[in-house]
Amino acid sequence: MAGVTLRDYQEDAVKRMKMGCILNGGVGSGKSRTAIAYYYTQYGGKVNVPNYVRMVNPPDLYIITTAHKRDLLEWEGELANFYMSTDPKVNIYKNKIVVDSWNNIKKYAGVKNSFFIFDEQRLVGYGAWVHSFFKIAAQNKWILLSATPGDTWSDYMAVFIANGFFRNKTDFQKKHVVFNPYTKFPSVLKYLVAQF
């Protein structure tokens, strides 16, 4: 079997990535392949070598993406490059691989000891998706992908909390947000830069 090939910048990204990171890249930059390559190398696979190197005991893989990407089977094409599939008859590893949409994230809140790729990061705010994400992040390994990075610190609040930098939303806001005292509703006046 032929080996998996990455572009130089993708291989560099895989080497720099850590669990709980956000992989930012433009549309069409190869974030999906890079994310799968990160998962693949974490469990013994090797990229940019002539022959395919199998993973060793990979955990189940869950990919949470947009309904559009799920329905177009975009992730299936990328998985095939690594001899993986959501079809158990074709997947050489026999681990569970699921591609589903953000609308169904709550279904996976009880999953443990797996690896999650969250595509098109949708963790802005503090709603139901974020609460399900916290449950998943606490019991699994995970990374996020985004082509549209957030504009403010609070856009990343869920990621900071999931990585253990803050206990909760209140802890984050005490350290980084100044609210306007002259409005009847919570309105952000400014964000504070972290002091180390």
Over which residues does each language-model region extend?
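Conserved pre-motif I regulatory segment
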Residues: 1-24
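Conserved P-loop NTPase motor "coupling/switch" region that bridges the ATPase
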Residues: 59-60, 115, 132-196
